[in-house]
Amino acid sequence: MSNSHPLRPFTAVGEIDHVHILSEHIGALLIGEEYGDVTFVVEKKRFPAHRVILAARCQYFRALLYGGMRESQPEAEIPLQDTTAEAFTMLLRYIYTGRATLTDEKEEVLLDFLSLAHKYGFPELEDSTSEYLCTILNIQNVCMTFDVASLYSLPKLTCMCCMFMDRNAQEVLASDGFLSLSKTALLNIVLRDSFAAPEKDIFLALLNWCKHNAKENHAEIMQAVRLPLMSLTELLNVVRPSGLLSPDAILDAIKVRSESRDMDLNYRGMLIPEENIATMKYGAQVVKGELKSALLDGDTQNYDLDHGFSRHPIDDDCRSGIEIKLGQPSIINHIRLLLWDRDSRSYSYFIEVSMDELDWIRVIDHSHYLCRSWQKLYFPARVCRYIRIVGTHNTVNKIFHIVAFECMFTNKAFTLEKGLIAPMENVATIADCASVIEGVSRSRNALLNGDTKNYDWDSGYTCHQLGSGAIVVQLAQPYMIGSIRLLLWDCDDRSYSYYVEVSTNQQQWTMVADRTKVSCKSWQSVTFERQPASFIRIVGTHNTANEVFHCVHFECPEQQSTQKEDSSEEPGTGDLSTPSQQLDPHAPRAPSASSLPPSPGPNLHSPNQQNQ
């Protein structure tokens, strides 16, 4: 047998895969003119081809060559005016073999090749070529690549070009490719808030573009310049002599600059989605506060009473604070910070942003809420250079402590009401730093661990004595909550009564559900008018079996309904490996549930003991 063919790909026994041989043989038809029945002429170069192969691979050629038009005549010659011979050679090779080599071609040829893939309807080729172009973007080719990507509505390539230009704005403005941009592509670039070059540089680049493209409407181009961001000197000595903007436009810009708050100006800022920019990598630094070095070091594990955090004293006039200076003006809409959480303390605080350290805009106000541990904060996107966190309360002392700080722009969708997140997903989870601060359980946060299957007479629930205490869940931060869901212990036929209250400070409570006169079993869905909540208190008032209220699972807001899957499971089959510190569902009495017991203790009665 012949050994001339390369190693074949592995195939399963009973399967033959000789696609590579088929590709080689069909591709060989391109080398000579045998069997050719149509000829394309590109830049005076003739390309013999085979109608049936072209038609089989492409709807465009099927219509062209078999649609009854002039091109469908035998031995027809078809001139192509909108491409180059190099790009068409690459396309024919791809049509015949399914292969294309991009690495050795110039950017201009690759863009022509991409245009052909789009025109003739090869979406896979279009995607693959776009992906390769994303990897070779540079200052010299990004503008013409963006022009083509915009023309053919290629979202991934367009996005990558924009990100590259945003991060290299001044170099792009000075490149030759910038002068060759179409008007539409040009405006799409400079109108972006994230195209963060100095406004003077943008104006001068647009001025050069107008000189290079004298036939275009210069007034429309100049409207893209954000004149109020330029200094008075720049307006008078750079903009005014150009003659492209009217004196009224310049005077209006001066008026806006002098009468507006600085933070109301339409600033440009760096945009790096989904990446923390409060790092030394991006030039961020802590400029105010005590123990500055700990805040941005990225260590969220090694901290205690003495080290691993930044701090400031809490005073009544809120003059103290911790201030971070970013490496450059940046667009952010998301902040994550870790409040010191080695005990049960809570904090209150607010966050402000600024461009000049003089005019501050408050983006987060949790000064009237109790918060703990990780804070996941969202707000409308802002351009800022400085971020200030001011603590207003600590439930233990007069010092505000932050272990870690992150800020970024996120594309994650979020809903805000009255400045607070209205979550769609369950935020009463251990991962979201929620905790059970009142109630008795074998495991401190069994109520929040998401396990709705493994519970029985002895484990898997949280409880409190009727008439004494409650079950209280603290969320890490305030949310706008309009629903909760509970799973009441349901291993027998008992029923419960209860009510639910919410609070933001543990002082004032609002009742959101009153089921004290209702017999309730198993899953409970509670909906109410959406309102701020940091604490949820569940108070049992009746149990038909004994004097203890038992809850297996809690979530807020309510998620998709799930039920205990194996309804045939008998009590007593759950995991009993954890040391017990619970109240037995059948026990007639129980110790005070006002706080979590510090150490395990035995069950009070056997599972079968009932109230008499």
From Swiss-Prot:
It comes from the Eukaryota. Residues 36-104 form the BTB domain. Detected throughout the gray matter of the spinal cord including the motor neurons (at protein level). In the brain, detected in the neurons of the hippocampus and in the Purkinje cells of the cerebellum (at protein level). Also detected in the terospenial cortex, bed nucleus of the stria terminalis (BST) and the ventrolateral thalamus (VL) (at protein level). Residues 142-240 form the BACK domain. Pfam families: BACK, BTB, F5_F8_type_C. CDD domains: BACK_BTBD9 (cd14822), BTB_POZ_BTBD9 (cd18287). Residues 589-612 have a biased composition (Low complexity). Residues 559-612 are annotated as: Disordered. One of its GO terms (biological process) is multicellular organismal-level iron ion homeostasis. SMART domains: BACK, BTB. One of its GO terms (cellular component) is glutamatergic synapse. PANTHER family: BTB/POZ DOMAIN-CONTAINING PROTEIN 9, BTB_POZ DOMAIN-CONTAINING PROTEIN 9. This is BTB/POZ domain-containing protein 9.
